[in-house]
């Protein structure tokens, strides 16, 4: 469990390592969520029972898309003062967190989800025909679902969940609360991703998958 949690933090779930984040699950605990999970050896971590920031999860995808190079998510490119002079931005430095070959091979391992996997129907309905990596996700009771997708140009994640005081199962087509849920990550979450990304997918250059590294195959 420890290695898995540490890898999640390295790839982008950085808030898990912040002191006090375990208080969401134990109000009197000042540990980081990462230490809380590791100390109790909670193997269910890999199934996703803990809250996750969608920006950080998208940053995990961006790390893999960048050949294992983690950079802090930042929407600001440059800042200028009133005189037109550029103002220095103090940002955390980028970091090579896993070998490039490992990141590239994992991106290829995730490349079939939208071809023959659970994300394929949504990709086809949007007319998506570009190489990409993706993963659908659904909670056991269908109370939430999500889709993570990325190319060498973009990375994005979206969730659908019931944020009402009394959450229930969710059903698809149309999306709604229901008694016996059937919402999956490959339905509305994936459809939303492809609807948003298809028009802009090639705006910043050619979309391609990196080669796999034989050391990790």
Regions found by a protein language model. Give the residues of each.
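Short, exposed beta-strand "edge-strand" segments with a Pro/Gly-rich flavor and a Y/T-containing core
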Residues: 15, 26-31, 49-50, 91-98
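A penicillin-recognizing enzyme superfamily signal
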Residues: 51-217
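Active-site-adjacent bridging/hinge elements
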Residues: 8-39, 159, 164-172
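Active-site-adjacent helix/loop patches that line small-molecule binding or acyl-intermediate pockets
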Residues: 1-19, 38-66, 109-112
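Polar/charged alpha-helical tracts
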Residues: 6, 28, 34-35, 202, ...
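Short, well-ordered helical secondary-structure segments
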Residues: 32-34, 39-42, 123, 135-137
